[in-house]
């Protein structure tokens, strides 16, 4: 979870993981690094220009964007393997509220298991184990 723990008052940049129950969005993956098992979630390949806007001044705040962008954004295509598999957690999704927090994902953990900037991180083994059971109706509860 996030370095600042779990919060029901999540704000952009506070390093906390939002408290609540949320739907799951797209499964993003690095086709060059991961062979996907069967999965019922909608999928999208991460390309070199795939990003996620974390700049509340943008109309694309908390949405996938194409890089480069004049606004701040997380790059999803990384040297690190933490985003080889990621699922968008639908926090601050509909409607999007400026500065309430963005880019909350279920993704792979670092080897060191260090805290995230607000996401949920699990091992690749566990991610691949749960993936076949996830679908559009699946919810994640964070408490």
Show which residues each predicted segment covers.
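Cell wall/extracellular polymer interaction/catalysis modules
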Residues: 1-117, 124-143
């Amino acid at each position: 979870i996030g370095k600042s723990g779990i919060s029901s008052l999540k704000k952009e940049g506070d390093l906390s993981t939002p408290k609540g129950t949320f739907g799951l969005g797209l499964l993003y993956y690095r086709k060059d690094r991961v062979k996907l098992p069967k999965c019922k979630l909608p999928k999208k390949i991460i390309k070199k220009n795939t990003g996620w806007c974390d700049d509340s001044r943008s109309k694309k705040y908390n949405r996938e964007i194409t890089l480069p962008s004049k606004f701040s954004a997380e790059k999803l295509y990384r040297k690190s393997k933490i985003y080889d598999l990621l699922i968008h957690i639908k926090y601050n999704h509909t409607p999007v509220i400026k500065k309430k927090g963005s880019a909350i994902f279920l993704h792979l953990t670092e080897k060191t298991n260090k805290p995230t900037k607000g996401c949920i991180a699990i091992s690749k083994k566990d991610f691949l184990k749960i993936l076949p059971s996830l679908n559009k109706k699946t919810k994640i509860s964070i408490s």
